[in-house]
Amino acid sequence: MKIYKDIITGDEMFSDTYKMKLVDEVIYEVTGRLVTRAQGDIQIEGFNPSAEEADEGTDSAVESGVDIVLNHRLVETYAFGDKKSYTLYLKDYMKKLVAKLEEKAPDQVEVFKTNMNKVMKDILGRFKELQFFTGESMDCDGMVAMMEYRDFDGTQIPIMMFFKHGLEEEKF
């Protein structure tokens, strides 16, 4: 299994257990699912509660959301009230990524710059439909992932988007 981490903050963003698609060599689109699960739900294999005592069932907290967000402890951020503030963040973040690329993969700099401009125009056109998420550290200097719901055969499916060049792969 591969874990994809933010190269700036080290936060875990997602893993390869989800359906992934690379768009224009710069954006990973990761398909999520809406889930509901009990917090702290522990199931012990082979455990058989005593038949003599009535089960006093406890109220357990339930969490609902997109599996990628819950499993990797992503945090929704409301830092971008408008397209202008998000564009300012992107310009700053892209400079950081170009600096990292020049260090580690100079051959990728031109691919990144060319394709990123195209992809960002498309994303900015859908700005109002997007939700934004940081890693667990909630550090906006790192990657801010995007999520939108897309219609597939009448069903709304959450799709998260991550910048390929802002991630490092870690094998488990």
From Swiss-Prot:
GO CC annotation terms, alphabetical: cytoplasm
Record keywords, A-Z: Calcium, Cytoplasm
Predominant location: cytoplasm
Calcium listed as a keyword: yes
Organism domain of life: Eukaryota
Molecular function per GO: calcium ion binding
Entry's localization field: Cytoplasm
Gene3D superfamilies assigned: Metal Binding Protein, Guanine Nucleotide Exchange Factor, Chain A
Annotated ranges, domain TCTP: 1-172
Function: Involved in calcium binding and microtubule stabilization.
Family from the record: Belongs to the TCTP family.
PANTHER family: TRANSLATIONALLY CONTROLLED TUMOR PROTEIN-RELATED, TRANSLATIONALLY-CONTROLLED TUMOR PROTEIN
Name of the protein in question: Translationally-controlled tumor protein homolog
Name of the coding gene: Tctp
